[in-house]
Amino acid sequence: MKSVKIMGTMPPSISLAKAHERISQHWQNPVGELNIGGKRYRIIDNQVLRLNPHSGFSLFREGVGKIFSGKMFNFSIARNLTDTLHAAQKTTSQELRSDIPNALSNLFGAKPQTELPLGWKGEPLSGAPDLEGMRVAETDKFAEGESHISIIETKDKQRLVAKIERSIAEGHLFAELEAYKHIYKTAGKHPNLANVHGMAVVPYGNRKEEALLMDEVDGWRCSDTLRTLADSWKQGKINSEAYWGTIKFIAHRLLDVTNHLAKAGVVHNDIKPGNVVFDRASGEPVVIDLGLHSRSGEQPKGFTESFKAPELGVGNLGASEKSDVFLVVSTLLHCIEGFEKNPEIKPNQGLRFITSEPAHVMDENGYPIHRPGIAGVETAYTRFITDILGVSADSRPDSNEARLHEFLSDGTIDEESAKQILKDTLTGEMSPLSTDVRRITPKKLRELSDLLRTHLSSAATKQLDMGGVLSDLDTMLVALDKAEREGGVDKDQLKSFNSLILKTYRVIEDYVKGREGDTKNSSTEVSPYHRSNFMLSIVEPSLQRIQKHLDQTHSFSDIGSLVRAHKHLETLLEVLVTLSQQGQPVSSETYGFLNRLAEAKITLSQQLNTLQQQQESAKAQLSILINRSGSWADVARQSLQRFDSTRPVVKFGTEQYTAIHRQMMAAHAAITLQEVSEFTDDMRNFTVDSIPLLIQLGRSSLMDEHLVEQREKLRELTTIAERLNRLEREWM
């Protein structure tokens, strides 16, 4: 940026008269020019326009931004010049402006006004609203690259975004509309992609302008949304599970959009925080702005430098679904890490690992200070970022493969919970959590195990505190559920703790029935608590927690949690029935609690049975799929291993080297595909069936260990088949 200079400009003190004279007499010359790194830009009406906007439009914007933010010593020249020209434009008489040749008129944005009437231009898409009686709700709400953005309101109060062309970008809105039409026709509409209606003539100030109309998404951009979400996490308004589960929900939605675009053969090319808007009403993320789209394999019209995939800057590699996947992950990284606070860090550079020094520095109170883009330990999150941003295009997963990554398939929360969290984030209705948000550690589980053993010892001596042990068990169920989701405790320790909990329930049941040890001498006194006190302090909190659990959507990984909750309800019923039989008449309050416990147990049993049946069905499908792979699995595995061991290393350099590398890769791919040619259809059909099943099975630990083994075998076979299926479209 040190080479920036102003060329052909008037002094900062240029008068309005001089500005008028320059406009009228020297229209053929640039009004003001910048020269940045040998590239020329014009200063027009307080805007800087690249003379060739299709060669890195966003790249120049970053550099010029420094001039107008006061970071350059000579920024005042550009500012004063454009302020003066702006004033001259406003005060120039209509007669003078009409004499200005079209070239200069267009330079100042004064393009000829359309003669078409207000309303749709041509046939709008199906479902488009009636524009009769429309009015301008907001003008220039924000500017989007090559467009002005205004909000139009119909007589039915529907708000539409009007994307209006600037003169320098004439024709790009029609191309964008054609892209949406193509997507809708070939792949259909998508709830997380902007809903476009067509081109229309709309009011804009005292003019009429042609605009691309689409539904307004009322909400926040990605950076603001995730920054507020992170603040809620830090303030204890949501816990770690909710925060990361919501991040994963967003990632799944965005990758579903890139997969949808790929089905239509379209690449977005400009997914970034500013082009993802979160709907305040639904909590859903919506991808907008197809202005820089291309067809798969074509060179992109442009991109945002700090987010783009590296292959788009080397040789002649075209845009692809994988470059859009790269954009999704760099966008998420930017928002999660808070890169907007440090513009020198680029999200497409990925995470930087530091092992020679602490990844976090401490403040004066000894608390860690987050350093954006720095990782000191490997986690599923860091592996996800590295597996997509840190590999070449041929090794990068596509949308469906990325969704199968351990980071996105483990520790998820149900969609409705994630959307509610986002809606609360957008409306500012988050309330602090009262629960402990710290992670469950192995030490914590050992402490809880020791507490259970103490209760078991008390039972052996007929001194069991029934209320105390049931209250502790309720707390331990929550802790074990959380530990299983977080994945920070060894699987064997989790299994041991689960067994100890179930054993404690059996001991309580025997104790209540008077069969602990020598049943002939056992006591039937189960608790010093009065019935009412027991129900209010022990039964009620457990019922409320389990009822919330029942209202959620569950996956196979929740079966263990539901089994434990079912056992807890059974034990509470057993204890309460026994208390009710000790001499005094049963009160209406006790009947009420017994009925609520019984109803909750029935509902839980139904949900558990349904989930177990679905798991059995999935297990049967899994077995069938693995058997189907028998005809091709060994041949495909060996062919892929040979391809990986013989293919040349990716070279980055000149166009010539890139072309040579692609030729060599194509040759190796052709040999590999020939080896498995008779199984191509089988493998393609296999992945169509296996990928949805793998998403359903997830990556979390399951109670059925044999099912886990079969699931991982299916995952390996799917990876082999999917990679071979991609070879032709990637290299040939």
From Swiss-Prot:
The UniProt record gives the binding positions of ATP as 142-150, 163
One GO cellular component term of this record is: cytoplasm
Q: What is its EC number?
A: 2.7.11.1
Q: Could you give a GO molecular-function term held by this entry?
A: ATP binding
Q: Keyword set for this entry? A: ATP-binding, Kinase, Nucleotide-binding, Plasmid, Secreted, Serine/threonine-protein kinase, Signal, Transferase, Virulence
Indicate where this protein resides in the cell. Secreted
Question: Which reaction is the catalytic activity of this chain?
Answer: L-seryl-[protein] + ATP = O-phospho-L-seryl-[protein] + ADP + H(+); L-threonyl-[protein] + ATP = O-phospho-L-threonyl-[protein] + ADP + H(+)
Q: Which SUPFAM superfamilies match?
A: Protein kinase-like (PK-like)
Active-site residues, Swiss-Prot/TrEMBL: 270 (proton acceptor)
Domain Protein kinase intervals: 136-408
Family, according to the entry, reads as follows: Belongs to the protein kinase superfamily. Ser/Thr protein kinase family.
**Role of this protein:** Acts as a virulence determinant.
Put simply, this protein is called: Protein kinase YpkA
Q: Which organism is it from?
A: Yersinia pseudotuberculosis serotype I (strain IP32953)
